Structure formats: C-alpha cells, structure tokens
A protein has these predicted regions:
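Signature aromatic-anchored transmembrane alpha helix within multi-pass, membrane-resident enzymes
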Residues: 15-18, 164, 201-208, 263-267, ...
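Short acidic/glycine- and proline-prone juxtamembrane loop motifs at membrane-interface regions
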Residues: 36, 127-140
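Membrane-lumen/periplasm interface segments of specific transmembrane helices
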Residues: 41, 180-181, 193-265, 347-362
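Transmembrane-helix motifs of polytopic, lipid-linked glycan transferases
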Residues: 89-109
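Hydrophobic/aromatic-rich transmembrane helices and adjacent perimembrane loops
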Residues: 131-132, 138, 172, 178, ...
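Perimembrane helix-loop-helix junctions
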Residues: 154-155, 159-160, 178-205, 273-276
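Hydrophobic, aromatic-rich transmembrane alpha-helices
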Residues: 184-188, 253-283, 287-290
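Membrane-embedded, lumen/periplasm-facing catalytic core of multi-pass transferases
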Residues: 345-405
Length: 478
C-alpha cells in the first residue's frame, strides 16, 4: 500500500505540473482575454440563478444550456465582471490535463513514446488550442472522456469509476450518454443484478438531470434538443444528412491537420497487424462518437467541428503508432520496415511545419483581434453614461446576436434586457448597440455580414469607442 502511495504521488505531481505548465505557456504566448459565446451565456445563466430569477434559456439566439457549465460558472461569479477569466483558466488547465492524459493513455496501451508523440500532437493542434483559449466546454469534456478511457485501459470492466466520469461528462455533452449506455451493455454479462441496477443509475443520471433542468426552467424536458435544432436553422448551420461524410472527414482534418490524417491510417494498419486488442478500446470510442456526430442531422442538430474533438484526440494515438509503433516489435525485418514507415510519417509532418506555424500565428491574431473587440465592449457596457441610460431605458437592442450575453453580463442586466433585431428576433428597444468598422471588428463582422441596422429617428449617440457605438432614444440619457 505504501509503495502504491509513493508511486501515485509523483504521477499526480507530474499531472499537476503538466496541466499548470501548459496553461501558463498558452497564457503567456497568446494572452487570451475573452470566452466564447456559449461560455458567456453560461455565466449569464449562473448569475440569473444566484439572483433568484429564471435563467433566460429562451433568449434571442440562446445556445444549448449545459448544466455542468452553468454550475461551474456559478463559482466563477466570485470574480465579478472578470468571471470570464476564471473560466479561461479552467479551460487552459483542462487542456494541459488533456495533454497529460493523452500521453498516459498512449503509454498504457502501447508504448511511452507513442504517448509522447500523441501528446505533442494534441498540444500543437491550432484548432484545439483555439478552443482552449476561448473557453469551450469541449476541453473539460474531452478530459473526462479520455480519463474514463484510461481507467478502463488500466483495468477492463472497471465499472463504477468509468461510469462516474462519463456521468459528469454527460452534463457537458450528450455524446457521453451513448458511451455510458454502450459501456453498461459491455458490463452486463458478468455483472450481478444489484451491480446492474447500481450502474444503470449512473448511466441515467446525466440525461435525467439535464432533462429535469430543462423542464424546470422552460417547461420542456427536451428544450436543449429543440433549441439546438431551432438555433441551427436560424443560424443556417450545416445540418443535412447528405453533408455528413464530407464534413466528418473535413472536421477531422481541421482538428488534426493533413500530415496527421495521413499518418493515422498507417497507425491503424499497424494496430490491426500487431495490436488489435490494445487498439480496440480507443478505436471503439472513436467509432461510437463519430456515429453520434453523424446521426445528429437526423434530429435537426448541426455539424460542428468541435463535436469531433474528443475522437480526434484518440486518433492521435494511432499517429503515435505510425511514428513509433516499430518500438513494440522485436529486432528483425518487420521492425526495420516499420521504422522506415514511421520515419516517413514523421517527415511528412516536419515538412508541414512552416504551414503549421502560419496556422498557429492565425490563432494568435484571432485571439488578439477579437480580444480587443470584446474588451472594448466591456468598456462600453461599464461606461457610466451607458449604464445610466440602460437603467432608464432597457432593453438594449444589439444589431446582431453576438454581443448579447457579453453586454447583458457587463451591464448586470435582467433577463430580456438585451435583445437583437437580427432576423426579427425582437423589436427595437430604446437603446441600440452597433459595431464599428475597423480592424478589431473586421474578423467577426466581415464586409458581407456587417449588420445593416440604422438608429431610429430621434436616437442620438451617447457613447462610442474604437469598436462600438451606443445610441439612445430621447429621455434616456442625462
């Protein structure tokens, strides 16, 4: 027991150092300063709950509410208007944990160097870094799922511990419900009746909690399904079953980039020849999660790249096998051949480095430019003249949906106090928020999509900064 404890302490220390180290490096390199639209809405809903009002799940263009994201956002509210920074750090720490867990899973299933290569791939993917840098819940979700896979890899049919992690993950994304259900069926044959009942409770916990929260807030236990489908239609997102094959492949390519996608089939071939049993677990998870992604349009759900992020992380293990699988083989002709194949797979990735660096620089530019735009929005919402007018004349109308949760949070507004005229979602209020045309807003508001909304007659400008203007009706400002 003491030996086990001594072994666990260094492992936990390495995990903590890796998580914190990756988070600090990303923070220093990119200086992230804002969270994504969904995460900002979670902060708004958490604030509603703490104020004792019904969360505004049915607001104009509101995203899908994720129960765990809202619960965690409640803790971040202690930081006031800077609560988004707490969410950002949690996301960055989750990304660091994901890098570590990827290494541990590769080591457990195959070889330490397979884990090292896979972890380096995860660490350097522009799409994954970008999601971590703006606080998407897909980061902690991936950590929970990969953690569950690691527990199962260490001890097959582990049961409760794996299902517990999937239950928590199921409060962030519903794909975990399917994984939990399939795992429960896998546990069924040798399990006693009492164990089946106990594990079934864990399988059902997340979907029941999610449905209950939707029902309590909106009166519709399937609000998340209906709302997500409706928003996908409003935003004209990809949601046709005919688009599934193309965009599934495209999104995996976006997540891993081209050289990795060329290396993954090589790794799958190696696994088929030399490690089928060890590769079965991550391969099964990839297949199951990809199938859930592909089935989404049948229910009106959109095809979004982030939805394949967790299976993409698991595919990095097979790229690691392509590069380092030869280390698993005894000396001989096969080992030499696979060493050459691994060298080729690695060479393709190295040749792609200049393009890859450009993509990482694009992430940096996006974080910097969009961060400036949202910083200007916070300054506008906190300006005394704007807050005074808002107190007299709410609701504030935004030209489009993007500023809604940010403006509402920084204005300390009540449900319904910030709306949009986009697609006729709400009528014009007595205040209007408009973006300005400049470099800070140019990435989000391109020329073809810039809101074409004009202030109504009688409105006058009461505030402006480099990115935003605020107009108000007569009598709203001093």
């Amino acid at each position: 027991m003491r030996r086990q404890r001594r072994h666990n302490v260094p492992a936990l220390a390495v995990a903590a150092v890796t998580s914190v180290g990756v988070a600090v490096v990303l923070a220093l390199v990119y200086a992230p300063s804002y969270v994504n639209y969904d995460a900002q809405w979670a902060l708004v809903w958490a604030s509603d709950l703490w104020l004792g009002v019904t969360p505004e799940y049915t607001a104009d263009f509101a995203p899908t509410p994720h129960p765990l994201a809202t619960a965690v956002s409640s803790l971040a509210l202690a930081f006031g208007h800077e609560a988004h920074l707490a969410i950002l750090w949690l996301s960055l720490l989750s990304f660091g944990a994901l890098v570590y867990l990827t290494y541990r899973l590769g080591e457990e299933l195959f070889h330490p160097w397979v884990g090292v290569v896979a972890a380096l791939v995860v660490l350097t993917r522009p799409a994954m870094e970008r999601d971590a840098l703006i606080g998407y819940q897909d980061m902690p979700f991936a950590v929970l799922v990969i953690g569950a896979v690691l527990l199962e890899a260490r001890r097959p049919r582990r049961g409760v511990a794996v299902l517990a992690l999937l239950a928590v993950a199921g409060l962030l994304r519903p794909e975990a419900w399917v994984l939990a259900g399939l795992y429960w069926l896998y546990l069924w044959p040798p399990a006693a009746p009492a164990e089946r009942a106990r594990t079934a409770a864990l399988v059902l916990a997340a979907p029941l909690i999610w449905a209950a929260s939707d029902w309590i807030v909106t009166g519709d236990p399937l609000h998340s399904l209906h709302g997500t489908a409706a928003l996908a239609e409003e935003a004209d997102r990809r949601r046709s079953p005919e688009q599934v094959p193309y965009w599934t492949a495209k999104y995996f390519g976006y997540a891993l980039r081209e050289p990795m996608m060329l290396g993954v089939p090589i790794g799958l071939g190696f696994a088929w020849l030399y490690g089928r049993r060890r590769a079965a677990l991550p391969a099964a998870i990839v297949v199951a999660m990809t199938a859930v992604f592909a089935a989404g349009p049948l229910f009106g759900l959109p095809l979004i790249r982030r939805y394949v992020e967790t299976p993409a992380v698991l595919l990095t293990l097979f790229y690691g096998l392509a590069v380092c699988g030869w280390m698993l083989l005894p000396a001989g002709r096969a080992r030499s051949r696979w060493m050459a194949v691994g060298g080729l797979a690695l060479a393709l990735s190295v040749a792609y480095v200049p393009w890859h660096v450009t993509k990482l620089q694009n992430v940096d530019r996006r974080i910097e430019v969009d961060g400036r735009m949202y910083a200007h929005l916070q300054v506008a919402a906190e300006a005394p003249v704007v807050r005074a007018a808002f107190a007299r004349c709410a609701p504030l109308t935004a030209a489009d949906h993007r500023p809604i949760p940010f403006a509402r949070f920084w204005l300390d507004g009540a449900p319904g106090s910030v709306t949009t005229v986009e697609s006729g979602a709400s009528p014009m209020g007595r205040m209007l928020l408009l973006p300005r045309r400049n470099r800070s807003t140019g990435r989000v508001y391109k020329k073809s999509t810039f809101p074409r909304v004009k202030p109504p007659d009688g409105f006058r400008q009461i505030y402006r900064n480099p990115s935003w203007r605020v107009f108000a009706a007569p009598g709203c400002s001093a």
